Amino acid sequence: MIMDTNAVSFRARDEVTTQLAPGTGGQAVPTSNGMMTRFAMSESSLTDLLHKAATQYPNRAAYKFIDYDVNPDGFTETLTWWQIYRRAKIVAEELRGYGASGDRVAVLAPQGLEYIIAFLGVLEAGLIAVPLPVPQFGIHDERISAALQDSTPSVILTTSPVIDEVTKYAPHARAGQGGTPIVVAVDLLDLDSARELDLTPPAHSSTAYLQYTSGSTRSPAGVVLSHKNVITNCVQLMSDYLGETEKVPSTAVSWLPFYHDMGLMLGIILPMINQDTAVLLNPMAFLQRPARWMQLMGKFRGQISCAPNFGFELAVRRTSDEDMAGLDLGHVRGIGSGAERVNPATLQRFIDRFAPFNLRDTAIRPSYGLAEATVFVATAEPGRPPRSVNFDYQSLSVGRVERCANEADDGAKLVSYGSSWTSEVRIVDPEARTECPAGTVGEIWVQGDNVAMGYWRNPQLTERTFDAKLTDPSPGTSIGPWLRTGDLGVMFEGELFITGRIKDLLIVDGSNHYPDDIESTIQEITGGRVVAIAVPDADGEKLVTIVEFASWGHSGQEAIDKLRSVKREITSAISRAHRVRVADVVLVATGSIPVTTSGKVRRSSCAERYRNDGFTRLDRSA
């Protein structure tokens, strides 16, 4: 093998470490822990940021990937900023032989350093990246096919272990466009080549990448994100999280998949903004042993992380004191909870579980965002613990919010996302397109430089979503254009609360019901994944709940009695808390409810499967 004389790697004690890049004279590069780091707003592109990190901090660790397949205790592979930069340049040279300006390049690779090299290589080539998940062996993924058909990439980047599976998708990627995309295994390129590289900053289009939405209610759509969108949103995120743009966390820890907007931002892009380190692991490694997340936060002194609500729940349930022995979380500054409904009870359990290891409650940050706004829109002000309010269900059902008479009452407990953000946010009547008064539920509209340019080659959907105009806006509020998020929210006591999705709203017996609230009630009983759907019947729509129920070791009549007991408890709890009748409670095995690649329940698929009697019911005889 030809070794790169600019950055030579060697293995030692289950970790890949890196020698100094030439020209640094063996000088010690100071770590960034506790240092003042300025956000680089003068840089106009992600490639500018990568170049700056590589030249200013060549020997600083950029990305550490902890591989638990190689070693159950974790095998650490590290790339410095100089290494990642040179390897991305080598990938870029390869890509220039296959693609022209404006072409798309899809990345379908396992979670790992090769994925990062591939993604950054696309940007260094001046092309448009399309981050996607790697296909599962032997299973055709229609959503990957749909994203490839929509983006029509000229090249697909992958790795040698999965190239055969990925190649099966290539013929569908340019159906009707002519030509099949080239499939390139990044790990088979001579990434350690000693040859001289052209380090001239690349010419690039304004578009950095296409972020395909998870598509819980429709086919995935490619959100067109510019370099400006992404850099702006990084700065917004750090400013809203920390209340400053000078001191930034040094180490990010993430198990989120790179193809997901939050995983891409936290795991790959934010470290370039901070010019610091990301500690990364495979999502499956987290799911197998959730304790690994908090262990890495303690071991590597991670200061920022993020996860959906279920990640917090798993960490609470499956992390022991022994797992955390000798570890301290007092340095953690922000762990965001987003990408799905935030359950206040889950956050409190998380805070209580890790408080003995010095985790501050102010570090837990409920966060709202969506791919159409790059990823992040709002969080509460820094320095305060999560706040929640218990809202009366009956008021919510008619589009207003009122506190429950007392905290012990059954109600919708919602978290606050604060009152001051770097994005413009308004609550709007989606029909009249006028701003809603405080206390009235409406659609969340967003405005700012983080809002994407639109959907890839979908002008009709782009106009409906990104070009909304307000009628008679209040003083200081622009007419538009505004991003229509499709999310429902309300301003209460000056703060933002999110109630659900417009498309998910259930109308049963003439009243509005938020499925998230009903699902939260059931989860307090069963602890597993739940979906609440409305299914048409002769009198309108009926409420049906699909409930995943873990095996409990019972059999025969004892099992039947247990299932009946659970169904009665669920029916009673929903009737008492939400004043709505459940037409059917369907108990199914864990893993039965269809979800998107980011773990969100696919409600439309659930409804269709229920109508076709497609669920294998545990309660068939109960």
From Swiss-Prot:
Disruption phenotype: Deletion of the gene leads to selective loss of phenolic glycolipids (PGL). Its EC number is 6.2.1.51. Keywords: ATP-binding, Fatty acid metabolism, Ligase, Lipid metabolism, Nucleotide-binding. Pfam families: AMP-binding, AMP-dom_DIP2-like. Belongs to the ATP-dependent AMP-binding enzyme family. Catalyzes the activation of long-chain fatty acids as acyl-adenylates (acyl-AMP), which are then transferred to the multifunctional polyketide synthase PpsA for further chain extension. Involved in the biosynthesis of phenolphthiocerol, which is an important intermediate in the biosynthesis of phenolic glycolipid (PGL), also called mycosid B. This is 4-hydroxyphenylalkanoate adenylyltransferase. The lineage of its organism: Bacteria, Bacillati, Actinomycetota, Actinomycetes, Mycobacteriales. The gene is fadD29.
